[in-house]
From Swiss-Prot:
The gene is atpD. It is an enzyme of class 7 (translocase). InterPro entries: AAA+_ATPase, ATP-synt_VA_C, ATP_synth_F1_bsu, ATPase_a/bsu_AS, ATPase_alpha/beta_chains, ATPase_F1/V1/A1_a/bsu_N, ATPase_F1/V1/A1_a/bsu_N_sf, ATPase_F1/V1/A1_a/bsu_nucl-bd. It is a peripheral membrane protein. This is ATP synthase subunit beta. F-type ATPases have 2 components, CF(1) - the catalytic core - and CF(0) - the membrane proton channel. CF(1) has five subunits: alpha(3), beta(3), gamma(1), delta(1), epsilon(1). CF(0) has three main subunits: a(1), b(2) and c(9-12). The alpha and beta chains form an alternating ring which encloses part of the gamma chain. CF(1) is attached to CF(0) by a central stalk formed by the gamma and epsilon chains, while a peripheral stalk is formed by the delta and b chains. It catalyses: ATP + H2O + 4 H(+)(in) = ADP + phosphate + 5 H(+)(out). The keyword Cell membrane applies. NCBIfam families: atpD. Keywords: ATP synthesis, ATP-binding, Cell inner membrane, Cell membrane, CF(1), Hydrogen ion transport, Ion transport, Membrane, Nucleotide-binding, Translocase, Transport. Its EC number is 7.1.2.2. It holds the Pfam family ATP-synt_ab. Produces ATP from ADP in the presence of a proton gradient across the membrane. The catalytic sites are hosted primarily by the beta subunits. The keyword Nucleotide-binding applies.
Amino acid sequence: MSSGRIIQIIGAVIDVEFERTSVPKIYDALQVDGTETTLEVQQQLGDGVVRTIAMGSTEGLKRGLTVTSTNAPISVPVGTATLGRIMDVLGRPIDEAGPVATEERLPIHRQAPSYAEQAASTDLLETGIKVIDLLCPFAKGGKVGLFGGAGVGKTVNMMELINNIAKAHSGLSVFAGVGERTREGNDFYHEMKDSNVLDKVAMVYGQMNEPPGNRLRVALTGLTMAEYFRDEKDENGKGRDVLLFVDNIYRYTLAGTEVSALLGRMPSAVGYQPTLAEEMGVLQERITSTKSGSITSIQAVYVPADDLTDPSPATTFAHLDATVVLSRDIASSGIYPAIDPLDSTSRQLDPLVVGQEHYEIARAVQNVLQRYKELKDIIAILGMDELAEEDKLVVYRARKIQRFFSQPFHVAEVFTGAPGKLVPLKETIRGFKGLLAGEYDHIPEQAFYMVGGIDEVIAKAEKL
């Protein structure tokens, strides 16, 4: 165990001097003697000096303090003892429920599975949310991004997905809260506790108030726990299907930007770190399915200033199988979930995967909505009366489709008072098929708003 001393502190960046013969390796964890502070080596500056980033607050540190090298990367507890617990970036419990009872630990920096070990899957994961199941279906073992600006419902959508998938899915889940609000983390904990699935979820939080080093590594901590669950073999030699929720992947990038500037790297476009694509790749390449088990990940992605071409969301796009884009325009018109049916995509929306009927209905729905979008300008200038009869029909159907995409959520029940609805895929397809065929042309459009399946629409219309 080599030891050195602190020679410089600039915010979260600390320079430590070691003997030239015992300089720690990149990503080794160092412990500041007499404190709880852990440092991670980022650069070797020469002459025995290493530049490190602190994984916690640097308050109370001063030059000359002794630092001991652990000669290993940061490692965190893994296995079933982590379930039902809330941990920080170093795997220390922060839920005041005693230590995490496991001897097994893994380093947070690991290689992604090789090409030979990876396996793709086309099994669909039903979410019970109509617009997602119809237009951007999720794959088991796939990666999904929820893109949206501030306040359009990323976290609520993610909570509903957790509610619908994690509860129905008997497997294990890991939730990584990266640079988000502590209140949301607290809500999530109580939500899981109340629905009796807490014993199947491990939670890792590095929230907004944490230093950048902490927020930069907390996603890797959560991922390491998920990888262990995926790779742990049962008696038949099979791994597990694990769910990994990350809220919010943008804050991971942002923490990287803060660290990069502190380390003195030249910024690239829009002030992001020059290693943006590589850092994102290091995380995303590890979130994958192998021949023995799978990780299905759902990631919230904050979109700065609602600009999808910003380097951070643009880099994230490349790694995903399905993208769910939340739109401010749709949210402002009162339709929730505010998912943009024309912008959201999925690699699974293919007749060979979802079947010919589902594919054709999804594309027909998008065609109607696209035509309505084109007609909006004409309507704004000339009014509805100037449209051809068939265009009027398109408009009426499109407005019904838009309203039918809205759906009351279980997690929003406390705010709206409307009980949440979970719609099976077969019901969703049946409803939209009838809508396109004109079977419900006689029903007023308000009957389609905030309901579950098509049978509820008919029942609601009778009361109007």
